[in-house]
Amino acid sequence: MQHNQLLEQLYSGHSLSTSESTALFNAVIQGELSNEQIAAMLIALKVRGANTEEISGAVAASLQNAKAFPYPNYPFADIVGTGGNGQNTINISTTSAIVAASMGAKIAKHGNRSVSSKSGASDVLTALSVNVNVTPEQARQALDEIGVCFLFAQQYHSGFRHVAPVRAALKTRTIFNILGPLINPARPTYHLLGVYAPELVKTYAETAVALEHQHSFVVHGSGLDEVALHGETQVAEIKNGKIEYFTLTPEDFGLKTQSLESLRGGEPQENAQYLTALLQGKGKAEHANAVAANTALLLKLFGYDDLKQNVQNVLAHLVSGKAFETLQKLTTY
């Protein structure tokens, strides 16, 4: 079907099938649509609300066009959020990725520059002297040797440059704001995915099933795209094609409720200082607790089922300073 027919289908309020969505997003990523067509398509999807098939198709097209990553023969995970929650916290998922890796898990973290905060994953890593532009082969080597690597979205999804000016001009959230966590080019075995809005938990969970995720958690934590300690966290667990919905509280992690204010971050350089202190075992208790809760859920994907025990193990590990050694090694690639 021609692009124009697919666009016409969207304009008339009809949904696209997964294969139709894949075809249309392939055209976008390969630069076959004008800015006006891309804008119209994104707004049509936004006004109606993209469904599971449309999101799955967009993910499929993104992965088909992504730069290849040498696939490992061992299980590994990603911990990544949509961003865009406007809360401007410290880089919790980036820190959790490094901590989990230094505890023996394998984490291929997909990330980008900041969406709405002052410091996205690649911003803070750059401030920490990590080269976010390593080749796929170098990233894979880091994953093999130290258990963690960073995949900079812009490097793997170069076709997204065709959408960038349109997104900038529209100044509103579009389907591209929710694609990021789902399009890790390493195609992880496990996923801990954070979403910026509670209504996205179900959409994301159903999309994860459509994408045949082996074992994933989707979380929204009282306004945050990660596990919260200032309120409840809504969770969807996706395993073997089935979804289970539940709520987690700070008590489930053996932790006390703490204010969201205590996790406020700043510019990349400031967040880098918080992160360094934390990995050296000298960080703020509230920062350590937030990272421990998120890392605890991440470790559950690797079979460590006791969240309270996981939290205690992470907190003890942070005090040891071993996680900082992992960060130092990451800067050598």
From Swiss-Prot:
Anthranilate 2 binds at R167. One of its GO terms (cellular component) is cytosol. Mg(2+) 1 binds at S93, E226. 5-phospho-alpha-D-ribose 1-diphosphate binds at residues 81, 84-85, 89, 91-94, 109-117, 121. Binds 2 magnesium ions per monomer. It is an enzyme of class 2 (transferase). GO terms for biological process: L-tryptophan biosynthetic process. Pfam families: Glycos_trans_3N, Glycos_transf_3. Pathway: Amino-acid biosynthesis; L-tryptophan biosynthesis; L-tryptophan from chorismate: step 2/5. Its EC number is 2.4.2.18. Homodimer. Catalyzes the transfer of the phosphoribosyl group of 5-phosphorylribose-1-pyrophosphate (PRPP) to anthranilate to yield N-(5'-phosphoribosyl)-anthranilate (PRA). This is Anthranilate phosphoribosyltransferase. It comes from Haemophilus influenzae (strain ATCC 51907 / DSM 11121 / KW20 / Rd). The lineage of its organism: Bacteria, Pseudomonadati, Pseudomonadota, Gammaproteobacteria, Pasteurellales.
